[in-house]
Curated annotation (Swiss-Prot):
<feature type="transmembrane region" description="Helical; Name=7">
    <location>
        <begin position="261"/>
        <end position="281"/>
    </location>
</feature>
<feature type="topological domain" description="Cytoplasmic">
    <location>
        <begin position="282"/>
        <end position="345"/>
    </location>
</feature>
<comment type="similarity">
    <text>Belongs to the G-protein coupled receptor 1 family.</text>
</comment>
<feature type="topological domain" description="Cytoplasmic">
    <location>
        <begin position="116"/>
        <end position="140"/>
    </location>
</feature>
<feature type="topological domain" description="Cytoplasmic">
    <location>
        <begin position="195"/>
        <end position="220"/>
    </location>
</feature>
<feature type="transmembrane region" description="Helical; Name=4">
    <location>
        <begin position="141"/>
        <end position="161"/>
    </location>
</feature>
<feature type="transmembrane region" description="Helical; Name=3">
    <location>
        <begin position="95"/>
        <end position="115"/>
    </location>
</feature>
<dbReference type="GO" id="GO:0042802">
    <property type="term" value="F:identical protein binding"/>
</dbReference>
<feature type="transmembrane region" description="Helical; Name=5">
    <location>
        <begin position="174"/>
        <end position="194"/>
    </location>
</feature>
<feature type="topological domain" description="Extracellular">
    <location>
        <begin position="162"/>
        <end position="173"/>
    </location>
</feature>
<keyword id="KW-0812">Transmembrane</keyword>
<keyword id="KW-0472">Membrane</keyword>
<dbReference type="InterPro" id="IPR000276">
    <property type="entry name" value="GPCR_Rhodpsn"/>
</dbReference>
<protein>
    <recommendedName>
        <fullName>Probable G-protein coupled receptor 139</fullName>
    </recommendedName>
</protein>
<dbReference type="InterPro" id="IPR017452">
    <property type="entry name" value="GPCR_Rhodpsn_7TM"/>
</dbReference>
<keyword id="KW-1003">Cell membrane</keyword>
<dbReference type="GO" id="GO:0007200">
    <property type="term" value="P:phospholipase C-activating G protein-coupled receptor signaling pathway"/>
</dbReference>
Amino acid sequence: MEHTHAHLAANSSACGLGFVPVVYYSFLLCLGLPANILTVIILSQLVARRQKSSYNYLLALAAADILVLFFIVFVDFLLEDFILTMQMPPIPDKIIEVLEFSSIHTSIWITVPLTVDRYIAVCHPLKYHTVSYPARTRKVILSVYITCFLTSIPYYWWPNIWTEDYISTSMHHVLVWIHCFTVYLVPCSIFFILNSIIVYKLRRKSNFRLRGYSTGKTTAILFTITSIFATLWAPRIIMILYHLYGAPIQNPWLVHIMLDVANMLALLNTAINFFLYCFISKRFRTMAAATLKALFKCQKQPVQFYTNHNFSITSSPWISPANSHCIKMLVYQYDKHGKPIKVSP
């Protein structure tokens, strides 16, 4: 993320918002880090109990958000801009910048396979367990993490376009456009297309009911996450492109205020998922309360019964468990490696 304070430290108007950014980012870190750690704990329990692919994706998302909060909010904004009030040496600073882009790309792109997972569950329910299962999900998550890191290496040469002596080059334009496409335009296009198909599919079924909280709740969480992401990240993308191609802004104080607000909104996305899960899912809310209660009382949580082989008819909302005997289909269970095993009903 761009520095908007450190390089103007000598100027009395270095930060137009005064102490608002340091207070905001401190609050965001103190709120978001424990919330995401608690989310990891709860989702780890749900993954062990239910062997659901969507829980694995949400778990990976929480882990990526923790990395974003550490590298961007703590190291970049708080440590470098407000505590040290100076930039790190060039090479370590650029390495940290690569890790920042890697973490933010992972946080965004891990939602894409989750969207595909929900699309298959809703639109192709009978194929869901042959396509999406824990072993494959873990491979997809690992691939996303590795790919996002490797594709973030070119951001070692990411320009600081907000300095007064910045000189635009063609390589900088390419990097900026790649950033805008990879973190916003392409993911939002995928979210919009697949979510539109899901909504269309749901509305076509007049007898649709959210039977079994799995698909209904997870799909609602997906819609909420993607909608909030598109809203909170839009100001940052607009600011970057406007500053790159728009008319020169004579008031740098106003520029830095606008960028500060845009960055604040974008990073808010990494700290609020826990509260969205609690609001939407009663199961998650109950487990969060039990975990916090056990934590404050220094007690072990009661052992939850679960089976290593998770039987499931379907994750589709179209099929009621009461009516599943009317449908000719296969029942799947998972082996110890998380791969589905076909068992005749």
